[in-house]
Design a protein with these regions (language model features):
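Short, structured motif recognition centered on aromatic/hydrophobic residues
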Residues: 6-10, 24, 30, 52-54, ...
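Helix N-cap motif at beta-to-alpha junctions
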Residues: 15-17, 70-74, 216-220, 257
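Vicinal oxygen chelate
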Residues: 83-141, 184-187, 233-270
Length: 270
């Protein structure tokens, strides 16, 4: 397995980006974003220059998953492995790198045509991160940006791509029945975070099921839940604790695009 990757950023296309701006400010309490030439906005959740990017467009969907490599050598190795396996990996130009706030970037599609951006050198912001909504901040750093859960129609092919080619390890697997629907899932890690990526075979019109931000304190999670209720956001799952070995105490609610977000704390490292 290569040196640890980390989830660097997520890019969302939104039909109504103004709703996302209110969500980022009112729900997540994030500082004012950077505004790019194409109209996209880059939002901070820590010392990095941006972690969540919202770009205006005709669809509500996950436009890209950004994965940061340890260094340029690891990036080149991953690109070579992908190309040898028949995947078309293309280098991002200077304009895209500037937009993503990284030094170098290659992009490739996973087996279900989801865009993955492999990068190095995510820029740090000039000022410390501060949020009145999350005064204790979020757990990021070497663990990267929380996690993202993707909907996978072909779970085996997606596991082979993210595991066999990108080097994610399987933390645990899940099989459950929700009414008439049989759900299978695979939780995958690329560093000490329990999972930075999960793949779920379930009915959905979205590529993404949810993304998660890990708060540093339970107090901030509780206040976030109260804030979600006061803002009238649909609550998908009430406050509760995941079973071991994850152990996260969290809740799930809906983003302005209709897929979910999770705010949690006390996730166990592996």
């Amino acid at each position: 397995m290569p040196n640890p990757l980390r989830l660097a950023y997520l890019v969302f296309e939104a039909r109504k980006p103004a709703r996302w701006e209110r969500f980022m400010k009112d729900m997540l309490g994030l500082p004012a974003p950077a505004v790019h030439a194409d109209g996209s906005t880059g939002w901070r959740v820590d010392g990095a220059s941006q972690r969540l990017v919202v770009t205006p467009g005709p669809r509500d969907y996950l436009a890209a998953v950004g994965l940061e490599c340890a260094d340029e050598h690891e990036l080149r190795q991953l690109v070579q492995r992908l190309q040898a396996a028949g995947h078309r990996a293309e280098q991002g130009d200077a304009a895209l790198c500037s937009q993503r706030k990284v030094q170098h970037l290659w992009h490739v599609n996973d087996p279900e045509q989801g865009r993955v951006e492999l990068c190095v050198g995510l820029a740090e912001a000039a000022t410390p991160f501060a949020s009145a909504a999350f005064p204790d901040g979020f757990e990021t750093g070497a663990l990267g940006l929380g996690h993202v859960v993707l909907v996978a129609q072909d779970l085996a092919a997606m596991e082979a791509f993210y595991g066999g080619l990108l080097g994610f390890g399987v933390t645990e697997r899940l099989q459950t029945q929700v009414g008439p629907v049989h759900i299978r899932g695979t939780f995958m890690h690329c560093n000490q975070r329990h999972h930075s990526l999960a793949l779920f075979d379930l009915p959905s019109s979205f590529r993404i099921h949810h993304f998660m931000l890990q708060a540093r304190s339970l107090r901030d999670v509780g206040r976030a839940f109260e804030r979600a209720e006061s803002l009238g956001l649909p609550i998908d799952l009430d406050l509760g604790q995941h079973p071991e070995p994850d152990g996260t105490f969290s809740f799930y609610a809906e983003t302005p695009s209709g897929f979910a977000f999770e705010i949690g704390a006390q996730t166990q490292a592996i």
